[in-house]
Amino acid sequence: MRLAFLPLILILPTTHYAATPINGWYSGLFAGYAYIPSNVNKVNYNTRYTDATHKAGYLAGGNLGYKSNPLRYEAELSYFNANVAHFSQNNIRQDNVGGYNNGISGMANIYYDFSGIVSCLEPYLGFGIGYAWLREQLNNLTSNTQTNFRINSSAFAYQGLAGITYNFAENYAINIGYRYIRTPNMFSFGTTFQSHFAVLGVSYRFDDARYK
């Protein structure tokens, strides 16, 4: 029975000494896992490219924001990349392939931080709008049908975000979250772009004198 309470005993001292989050300016860095579904449905020189699936990718970026509890306002810049696993040409799957899907997004986000049972833990929800610059490179490496197809495009983008922040010091916090980004239908890709991210981030708050 005593062992059952051991995790709680270990957590309580940590949360007791953790800090209440403060209002003011902050900046942060984040990185994580990217899952990019198929986002190409395009005909090029009588060849249709579809079903471009990708290997596990990554996301990295930074942000600058202002917290006015319970809201946060933030500008964000991020880069993501995932290599191509396979794609189809004229509905025939191609497995001997190369290529990638990458992009840069600049977003303006707004968050709502929920006060938790423990003051240092804050679940959050967020929404952002901005612009994304995207590139898809599809290379068929089979010798008798070798092709290279590249798409470059940019579009309005929006995203939803959710996660939890742990304020382990008055000026520092870490957060773990999920985000989903999407664009409207893009002519160059023949469909919408969308991606899922699992993200770990760290933030530094500049103004250590302005408490909630």
Predicted features and spans:
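Cleavable N-terminal export/targeting peptides
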Residues: 1-23, 207-212
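Gram-negative (and chloroplast) outer-membrane scaffold detector with strong preference
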Residues: 19, 65-139, 198-208
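Short glycine/proline- and aromatic-enriched beta-strand/turn motifs that initiate or cap beta-hairpins
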Residues: 17-65, 201-209
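Membrane-embedded beta-strands that build the outer-membrane beta-barrel scaffold
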Residues: 27-31, 62-64, 73-77, 110, ...
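Residues that define the transmembrane beta-barrel architecture of outer-membrane proteins
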Residues: 23-25, 56-60, 100-106, 121, ...
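Predominantly the C-terminal beta-signal and adjacent terminal strand-loop region
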Residues: 78, 82-88, 160, 165-212
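Flexible, solvent-exposed loop segments that connect beta-strands
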Residues: 38-52, 78-103, 131-156, 185-191
